[in-house]
Regions:
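Histidine/cysteine-enriched polar flanking segments
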Residues: 1-116
Length: 116
């Protein structure tokens, strides 16, 4: 990974609008019992439905903890990519990379989210 001293804007990059076409979506498999009722069982069922719907039109990558990896892989369809990744919550927006583009190159911007 190359870390730059410039900002994306300085290099001619911008964050595409949410409605812009994009390559794929990153989601985090629900796990935390303090965020999800009843051991996240109902949340996981709904999550699988959401992932399956999104995957009809774009690539989906699901990040799951080591503890939940096999469960996620079993519950999700085979065409949805599952990767093992530790996380603190299901909100990828708070700590996954933000992708920016200059029209031909894509960069990931990292964040140091402190959970407020």
């Amino acid at each position: 990974m190359k870390v730059l001293d410039t900002t994306p804007r300085q290099d001619g990059f911008h964050m595409p609008a949410e409605f812009s076409p994009h390559y794929g979506c990153i989601l985090i498999f629900p796990e935390r019992s303090d965020s999800w009722q009843y051991g996240a069982y109902a949340a996981r069922k709904a999550f699988v439905q959401v992932c399956t719907a999104i995957a009809r039109s774009e690539k989906v990558t699901v990040c799951a903890s080591a503890k939940q990896y096999e469960n996620a892989r079993r519950m999700l369809p085979p065409h949805i990519r599952v990767v093992e990744m530790s996380s603190n919550d299901s909100w990828a927006r708070d700590y996954a990379p933000t992708f920016v583009t200059n029209g031909s190159v894509i960069r990931g911007v990292t964040w140091s989210f402190n959970a407020w």
